[in-house]
Amino acid sequence: TQGMIGYWLLQAMQNALPGRQVASMVNQTLVLAGDPALEHPTKFVGEVYTRDEAQALAATRGWTVRPDGEHYRRVVGSPAPQRVIETRLVRTLLQAGAVVICAGGGGVPVIRNTHGKLQGIEAVIDKDLTAAVLAEDLEADALLILTDVNGVYTHYGTPHAKQIPRATPTTLRALNPPAGSMGPKVEAVCRFVELTGDMAAIGRLHDATRIIQGTAGTIITPGGSYGQPNDLQPPQPAAGGPERA
């Protein structure tokens, strides 16, 4: 994710913003070695196998395998992100005016071993939760989770579906969104709003500017409101100064 997709995003941003410095980084994300999620694997990774192949790999390599459609795949734990190791470097690049692409796929999971050294582990970190942690540490003005739907809906997938334009963390969590799709996005924006008191939003990629203006997406704030949309403008970098994340 960080290599191939990072390269695609890097090139697209360079073509869209000629003259602007763009950096794509490989990041490590710190997790707790004792996180209970590591003992309860849920995330599919790697290739697909037949049942016999999967059982043989489970026996020889100690993997946990589960059915995935007609085949079997390995599953690993998804521990909660604590912080992105390279946060200071990301901040330095942002202060220099660069556009930074980072924490793809949630980052490479690492722990601190008994000697205090970083050590990689086999796990998958939720990318939305990592984005929330990084945004908080960078003191970002807002967290936008951009996807392929207009926002968060009640009764999604039914004739009664209705988009939610404004919400608080409490009202959004009460919807109990599916754990494998919208759930992590909702939890990420709720955590960011609760910890910072700032705005977060979920919406369509092409609506990013309108979301900042308050006219699109689902916007989450502590009080469930976001100023007067007509008076809001996308944040601009100060003349001669750094651009906020």
Q: Language-model segments: what does each one mean?
A:
Residues 1-245:
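C-terminal catalytic "cap/lid" subdomain
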